[in-house]
């Protein structure tokens, strides 16, 4: 398992309590995952940190409603994180949750398609399939790579995306779920 410094664990526990509190009024995570929140959500998000070589970067997290993985990665040391979320209620939650981190977090309350931004790494979790993700981010410049938390249909998503897009990828096994994969995508280009 991952070794996590005590001060980060304490901040992640505060974040966990905040998500559970807000989840009662706005649906941030599935109710049937609340009992296993640390494993299912915190560690699932935190495992991405091992694929981020330099934490002094700008990371963009799309569909960030619950702050997973964006806020978790900020708490773990990523210097600058932008969270893109269209739902204003979830942005209010993200604003409160962002105070837990010592790093720079920007909340962008817009549809992803309308956001113009540059970043080193783009993340998302429980958002959509690869084709939809790639189509949504037409105005986002990703210099280094994508770190995408995917489920059991990841191979089908790759095959379908390869019909419209050129990209390199690595598949990493999730440490939290046998079906889960981390898809590391680079050099994304749309086919003509």
UniProtKB/Swiss-Prot annotation:
Broad enzyme group: transferase
Organism: Rickettsia africae (strain ESF-5)
Key words, A-Z: Cytoplasm, Methyltransferase, rRNA processing, S-adenosyl-L-methionine, Transferase
Cystine pairings recorded for this chain: none
Protein name: Ribosomal RNA small subunit methyltransferase G
Similarity remark: Belongs to the methyltransferase superfamily. RNA methyltransferase RsmG family.
Residues reported to bind S-adenosyl-L-methionine: 63, 68, 112-113, 125
GO cellular-component term (any): cytosol
């Amino acid at each position: 398992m991952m070794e996590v410094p005590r001060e980060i664990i304490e901040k992640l526990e505060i974040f966990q309590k905040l998500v559970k509190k807000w989840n009662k009024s706005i649906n941030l995570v599935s109710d049937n995952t609340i009992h296993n929140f640390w494993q299912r959500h915190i560690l699932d998000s935190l495992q991405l940190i091992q694929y981020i070589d330099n934490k002094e970067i700008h990371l963009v997290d799309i569909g960030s409603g619950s702050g997973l993985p964006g806020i978790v990665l900020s708490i773990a040391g990523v210097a600058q994180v932008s969270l893109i979320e269209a739902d204003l209620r979830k942005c209010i939650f993200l604003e409160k949750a962002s105070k837990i981190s010592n790093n720079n977090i920007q909340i962008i309350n817009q549809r992803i398609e309308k956001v113009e931004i540059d970043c080193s790494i783009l993340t998302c979790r429980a958002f959509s399939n690869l084709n939809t993700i790639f189509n949504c981010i037409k105005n986002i410049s990703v210099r280094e790579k994508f770190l995408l938390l995917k489920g059991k249909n990841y191979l089908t998503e790759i095959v379908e995306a390869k019909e419209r897009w050129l990209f390199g990828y690595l598949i990493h096994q999730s440490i939290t779920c046998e079906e889960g994969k981390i898809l590391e995508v680079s050099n994304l280009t749309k086919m003509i």
